[in-house]
């Protein structure tokens, strides 16, 4: 009987601990795909909010604008490294909804020339002829970039609102440091800028 009391006490303590966490603990990080590098996965995940990180998918873009999956996730968020790509900072990681990967592939293809005016012209042409992939309305893009990992700008979040305008959202179209604003209003690129995080 003396041995049973400590076991019951431990079982009750574990049960109470689980209840305090909403009845379940956070799932462990997902396994990597064969051949994937933990360092590559960890770097891409730096852009993700901590609460979404362990269950996010991580991909690696290829030169043909397709990608390899380094880790399959379960929460719909996809993270990737854009460091050193044309028109990107030397350190640049990003996460967004899996629904936005076709759009990101178009972005990378347009930026491949390394010429900002050519890139913008290509994306504008896609917008005008109706072939520009639209982001999922309300989807979030998480960005972290800078000259190196130790000198990044504050996290930025943008929320895709394709077609939205100042009139439809009630947000200003002019940049402001103290709050959200809408950029590229009225286009498929329209998004809410949220400085800092």
Residue ranges of each PLM-predicted region?
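Positively charged n-region of N-terminal signal peptides that target proteins for export
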Residues: 1-4
């Amino acid at each position: 009987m003396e041995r049973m009391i400590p076991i019951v006490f431990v079982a009750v303590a574990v049960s109470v601990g689980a209840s305090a966490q909403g009845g379940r603990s956070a799932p462990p990080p997902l396994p990597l795909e064969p051949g994937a590098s933990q360092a590559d996965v960890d770097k891409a995940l730096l852009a993700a909010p901590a609460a979404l990180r362990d269950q996010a998918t991580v991909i690696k873009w290829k030169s043909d604008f397709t990608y390899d999956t380094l880790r399959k996730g379960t929460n719909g968020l996809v993270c990737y490294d854009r460091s050193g790509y044309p028109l990107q900072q030397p350190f640049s990681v990003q996460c967004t909804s899996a629904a936005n990967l076709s759009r990101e592939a178009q972005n990378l293809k347009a930026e491949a020339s390394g010429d900002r005016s050519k890139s913008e012209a290509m994306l504008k042409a896609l917008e005008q002829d109706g072939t520009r992939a639209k982001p999922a309305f309300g989807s979030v893009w998480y960005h972290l970039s800078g000259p190196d990992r130790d000198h990044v700008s504050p996290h930025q979040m943008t929320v895709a609102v394709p077609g939205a305008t100042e009139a439809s959202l009630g947000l200003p179209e002019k940049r402001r440091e103290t709050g959200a604003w809408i950029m590229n209003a009225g286009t498929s690129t329209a998004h809410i800028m949220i400085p800092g995080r």
